[in-house]
């Protein structure tokens, strides 16, 4: 699982007072977002964190994905693409609601009769809550691109000799509306997921940490890599976050986008130990429980980092960056 958490969500117990640096960061985020709207790179929808993208914005993402392909293509990963929705039964089994209930998004639909429909329309006409009788469907919005992968691979039986390596990409949803253009509610995540022995997956993670730094260097972005934790919910979540950091299970590649003091996580490197192997029944060829790790690219965030550092006019980007992305 990859959960990007460069800018921690503000907990409900905070007071209304915020440090001056926070106010400055929020101003920078809003200013950058306004410029992106003015240039037409992002398209406002009236909902914070839900944006259309221009052809130019999409072209930058496509170019960076080709760089990902060139970097990892020789590894022989199996490419799988899932829709941005996951089987609700898989979602429930994943335990996501135990750790991140504040981020989840479920899909509800009208399932009533004609009289219920009349009541719904009346409620809409009167400005009432027409959603109260909507029922949950069997689909949940995908919270992380790799979530549908684990049950899918488990159904195949034991992993082949040498384990498994998978290339996945999906739109993901996180309910955290924000004026920060780098914290979107619907965004794309590209991942490589490794399943194998502990040494296999930790080596995989280190390889991609090294590759990530080189990739960002090639496109003119200054980065740092730091230990991190996922935004676990509640008081118990603080203990989980501390354990995650103490065991060095998560690292993030950070790039300043809207703030130099609070850089944005644009890549994430996660070691799950055998947690997903145990949960989903992922086994090695010899019957041992598989360990898993993943590397995630936040595609919109990387594109935003490029625009923030090199300018909103791609024609004026440094020649070396253009050559790296478009050849």
From Swiss-Prot:
Cofactor note: Binds 1 Zn(2+) ion per subunit.
Enzyme class, first EC level, given as a word: ligase
UniProt: an L-alpha-amino acid binding residues: 191
The keyword ATP-binding is annotated on this UniProt entry: yes
Keyword list, A-Z: ATP-binding, Ligase, Metal-binding, Nucleotide-binding, Zinc
Annotated SUPFAM superfamilies: Class II aaRS and biotin synthetases
Keyword Ubl conjugation listed: no
Single annotated GO MF: ligase activity
Catalytic reaction(s) noted: an L-alpha-amino acid + holo-[ACP] + ATP = an L-alpha-aminoacyl-[ACP] + AMP + diphosphate
UniProt cofactor(s): Zn(2+)
The enzyme's E.C. designation: 6.2.1.n2
Classification via CDD domains: Gly_His_Pro_Ser_Thr_tRS_core
Binding residues for ATP: 174, 176, 183-184, 250, 265-268, 301
Annotated residues for binding of Zn(2+): 146, 191, 294
Function: Catalyzes the ATP-dependent activation of L-alanine, and to a lesser extent of L-glycine and L-serine, and their transfer to the phosphopantetheine prosthetic group covalently attached to the vicinal carrier protein Atu2571 of yet unknown function. May participate in nonribosomal peptide synthesis or related processes. L-proline and L-glutamate are very poor substrates whereas D-amino acids are not substrates for ATP-dependent activation. Does not display tRNA aminoacylation activity.
Additional remark text: Lacks the N-terminal tRNA-binding domain compared to class-II aminoacyl-tRNA synthetases.
Family annotation (NCBIfam families): PRK07080.1
Subunit composition and interactions: Homodimer.
Family: Belongs to the class-II aminoacyl-tRNA synthetase family. Amino acid--[acyl-carrier-protein] ligase subfamily.
Record-given protein name: Amino acid--[acyl-carrier-protein] ligase
Organism from which the protein derives: Agrobacterium fabrum (strain C58 / ATCC 33970)
């Amino acid at each position: 699982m990859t959960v990007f958490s460069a800018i921690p969500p503000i907990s409900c117990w905070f007071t209304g007072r915020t440090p001056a640096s926070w106010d400055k960061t929020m101003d920078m985020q809003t200013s950058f977002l306004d410029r992106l709207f003015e240039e037409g790179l992002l398209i406002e929808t009236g909902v914070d964190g839900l944006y259309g993208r221009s052809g130019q914005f999409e072209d930058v993402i496509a170019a960076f994905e080709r760089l990902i392909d060139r970097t990892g293509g020789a590894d022989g990963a199996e490419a799988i693409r899932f829709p941005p929705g996951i089987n609700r039964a898989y979602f429930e089994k994943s335990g996501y609601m135990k750790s991140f209930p504040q981020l989840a998004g479920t899909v509800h639909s009208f399932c009533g009769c004609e009289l219920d429909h009349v009541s719904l329309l009346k409620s809409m006409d009167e400005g009432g809550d027409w959603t109260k009788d909507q029922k949950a469907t069997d689909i949940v919005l995908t919270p992380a691109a790799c979530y549908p992968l684990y049950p899918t691979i488990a159904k195949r039986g034991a992993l082949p000799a040498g384990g498994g390596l998978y290339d996945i990409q999906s739109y993901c949803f996180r309910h955290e509306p924000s004026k920060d253009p780098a914290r979107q509610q619907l965004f794309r995540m590209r991942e490589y997921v490794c399943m194998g022995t502990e040494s296999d997956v930790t080596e995989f993670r280190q390889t991609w940490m090294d590759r990530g730094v080189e990739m960002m260097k090639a496109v003119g972005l200054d980065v740092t890599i730091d230990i991190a934790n996922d935004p676990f919910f509640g008081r118990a979540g603080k203990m989980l976050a501390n354990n995650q950091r103490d065991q060095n299970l998560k690292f993030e590649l950070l790039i300043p986008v809207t703030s130099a003091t609070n850089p944005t996580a644009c890549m994430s490197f996660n070691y799950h130990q055998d947690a997903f192997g145990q949960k989903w029944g992922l086994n090695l060829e010899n019957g041992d429980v598989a360990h898993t790790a993943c590397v995630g690219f936040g595609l919109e965030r990387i594109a935003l980092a490029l625009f923030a550092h090199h300018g909103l006019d791609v024609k004026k980007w440094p020649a070396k960056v253009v050559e790296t992305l478009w050849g």
